[in-house]
Amino acid sequence: FAAVSVDCSEYPKPACTLEYRPLCGSDNKTYANKCNFCNAVVESNGTLTLSHFGKC
């Protein structure tokens, strides 16, 4: 069983696209796309993780 993960090594980015590919974070918040999620991961100092793909 592999853990669900997203590579956030290219982040943070100053601006995200409006692409809608939702991800659910460990904070039980739905992020619109990988960019928004990864920016939040960076802001959380790595405490935020991916719960699953799709809405929470």
Swiss-Prot record:
UniProt-recorded Gene Ontology molecular function terms: serine-type endopeptidase inhibitor activity
Tagged with keyword Secreted: yes
UniProt protein name: Ovomucoid
Gene3D superfamilies cross-referenced by the UniProt entry: 3.30.60.30
InterPro entries named in the record: Bifunctional_prot_inhibitor (IPR051597), Kazal_dom (IPR002350), Kazal_dom_sf (IPR036058), Prot_inh_Kazal-m (IPR001239)
Residue ranges of every copy of the Kazal-like domain listed in the record: 6-56
Species for this entry: Callipepla californica (California quail)
Glycosylated residues (UniProt): 45
Site, Reactive bond 3: residue positions: 18-19
SUPFAM superfamilies xref list: Kazal-type serine protease inhibitors
Disulphides: 8-38, 16-35, 24-56
Cellular localisation: Secreted
Keywords from the named record: Disulfide bond, Glycoprotein, Protease inhibitor, Repeat, Secreted, Serine protease inhibitor
Record-level GO cellular component terms: extracellular region
Free-text note regarding domains: Avian ovomucoid consists of three homologous, tandem Kazal family inhibitory domains.
Pfam families named among the record's database cross-references: Kazal_1 (PF00050)
